Amino acid sequence: MKKNIINILIILCAVAPLFSCVKDQEFLEEAPKTIYTVDNAFSKSSQVDAQVARTYYAAYSLYVWIDGNIFGAFSGSPSSTLLGYGSDVIEGNAAIVNAGSAFSHFDNLDPLNGRFLSLWNALYQLASYANLAIYGADQVSWSSDAEKNDLVAQAKFFLAFSYLRLAECFGSVPLVEEFNQELRYDYVRTPRSEVYAFVIKNLEEAVAGLPNYPAQDGRVAKGAASHFLAEAYIAQGIETGDKSYFNKAVSAANATISLHPLMTERFGVRANPADKGTTGMFNIPNYREDGSPFFDLFQIGNYDRSEGNTESLWVMETPTYDQQAAANSGQSNNSIVGCAQPYRDLIWKDQYKETKAPGPWAAAARMDMAKYPFGSAGPYCGGGSWGMYGSNDYIDEYVWQGDFATDDRNSQAILIDPVVMDMDHSMYGQVISKDMLTEPARYMRVSGKVNLPDAWGFDSHCIIMGQGPQAMFGRDVYAARSAETYLLLAEAQWRNGNSDEAAKALNTVRVRAHCSKLFSASEVNMVTILDERARELSWEEHRWPTLLRLAKEGETNTVMHDQLRAHAQYVNDNPVYPGTAPKWSLFAIPLSVIQLNTGAEMPQNDGWK
């Protein structure tokens, strides 16, 4: 081959003088095959699959913290923003942030805030990856139409998902329907309703092209696409005032539910009574007698449909230690470190301090290592996490008051009260309450979705040298479960005037959690639904998109404002630094986006200076 190329070059040099200057110029233009462009990047179907895989990785960063940068949380990780940082459910840990730096100190926010730009960029990057995969699918040959249709449907799912989140969070946004590699400065904002229509079209096509169930764990299928289609229908119904979209949402939600029934019985690891009396790693019991179906959903080894979990719609597959090591050409503990909740920031009032036990626990405290392997660095204490995030009183206390207390989701197996862990303290083993602490705002219950209630299931390789297991390492994360689909169904039915059916959908989720309180039709409203979403989906759902889609663009989002006024950390929970509810109903368009768009006007959202 090399000899042939040289011969061709000699011939070209000999005849070159016969060509005009134009031909000379054409001859000088190079087309090196080692430089990939959109025109030559795709030559076989596996490259399209690789591009689709890239969209999954981009989506992963919208649900979990993956880069191991503990300070990335406060420089604006898109995942933490979407998951509700600064909303009614989650805020920065009070030991780290203060009223001045907290997102829920809404008076301090402006369009320069890095969270808005990082979220904007991440969502548009995901859309670009999806558009490139769709483009590439038409450039190659396929072994079958089914193979092509499946991958294109996955790409359309991600294209729709990215614009669904953009429209929910920012309202009207520039809509780029096809892959574009040209640098532009003249984008205009497409009306929110038109963006939602684009989302719906692509999700409907994704539903048609996807299989009932994914061939590989972590991939999306009909259930996930129909779930987000139901959400898009609801959003469009709110935006346009056309109630027919709520009927469509009901149909889409039911399509998902028929494929993915709730897990109503105990299942998987730690659920077999025959394992009672046996222990696993670190001598921790294999059987959790106090578990429940809800508890089982969040155990390592129980997340995927292939593991027996019919409720699972879409799972973010977190690499194991060995997979991380292979990808990084060496051993690595790098994983999710930002969000696990630590005990270590609790500080006694003077009357509770004792000579040999100065705190609820301390690094030097004498702890029962059989009960708490790794001591203060164990998973129940935050593991290797810096505890960047903390739960608000709303999801720790408010939603469990009165008749709502009896609930598997409120049990000590899944939502754990801090206890005195220092064996030298006279209150060893007792539950800590806020009135014992110098800074009650640091108090939080520990979610078993984030921390684990014990060290069962950790790979022994995943232990930070001299400390405990890296928080959440090797643990998968739900992007969607059919329990949330029931809550979308409840909202669609309520908005369509069918409160009886809405209560039925809510109660299906509550019955699974063995709740003593069930809803009547007269009790159902949007606040009821938001409360139930908090009980079922805390630390899981994209809370800000849920709140921001509750009003038509240009109108005041009263439900969101009331929710934040009542429950946001630095509006309600912190009595020393009370703030105010936001004046805006949508996130700010990032200032740099407006400034760089010199070829067309990019107006800012209402309520932002």
Segments predicted by a language model, with ranges:
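C-terminal substrate/ligand-recognition segments
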Residues: 113, 371-509
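Conserved, well-structured interaction surfaces
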Residues: 37, 43-51, 57-68, 89-170, ...
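Long, intrinsically disordered, low-complexity segments
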Residues: 20-22, 123, 198, 276-358, ...
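Short coil/turn linking the two alpha-helices of tandem helical-hairpin repeats
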Residues: 167-168, 172-174, 214, 235-242, ...
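An aromatic- and glycine-enriched ligand-binding surface/loop that stacks and positions planar moieties
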Residues: 22-93, 240-429
